[in-house]
């Protein structure tokens, strides 16, 4: 396994960090069988990748071995986000037969956290993710990790998350209140449910914590989001 140094320049506030700890606790309380977790959102730019990275770091800090898998093989963001300047190989190259597993898993300088980058943009992402090779790959790597956190493209725009959901133990749905309509969230969640993946809960992101005007988030069961949204639409 290759080693790589990542740079995280984010400066998260107290409320954000506490929310991450709450999310981590809820993930752990979901049960020992929940290891492969898909994290998606309705639309782009809702802060999903920041939450995935923070959750991976938090789980690693308590001794859990974590694999962060960037499954957005349409438009990967982690290379630039984490200051990677060297050439790396990624998931799209593995799925297309251009690399093997050992070529794409990188040991990072973050405690107990490995990463797989998305790789170059693939011409047929949902097709590659539907292949048996991806399912076999997930079964193999889950033997070595406490948690596999899969960052997918937004399910409200492309079908990839629903395809990946067929092979996952659970899913977390990220929502930015005020910018995502209830009907859009309901439609996206319904598509994810049809994949057969258990929805563990929802993350309400970019919540204005009035105490310090920073953005934070909190974790709720997704059914609670439905109830609140319905009340707001009355």
Region spans (language model):
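Helical hairpin unit composed of two closely spaced alpha helices linked by a short loop
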Residues: 61-67
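Conserved beta-strand segments of the P-loop GTPase G domain that flank and frequently precede/overlap
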Residues: 38-40, 117-118, 150-151, 173-176, ...
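Hydrophobic positions on the alpha1 helix immediately C-terminal to the Walker A/P-loop
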Residues: 50-51, 55
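Conserved nucleotide-binding/hydrolysis micro-motifs of P-loop NTPases
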Residues: 73-75, 100, 120-123, 155-156, ...
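P-loop/Walker-type NTP enzyme "switch/lid" segment
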Residues: 2-21, 25-32, 41-46, 57, ...
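Hydrophobic anchor at the start of a short beta-strand
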Residues: 66, 148, 171, 199-200
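Hydrophobic micro-sites
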Residues: 2-5, 186-234
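Inter-motif core of Ras-like GTPase G domains
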Residues: 140-143, 155-178
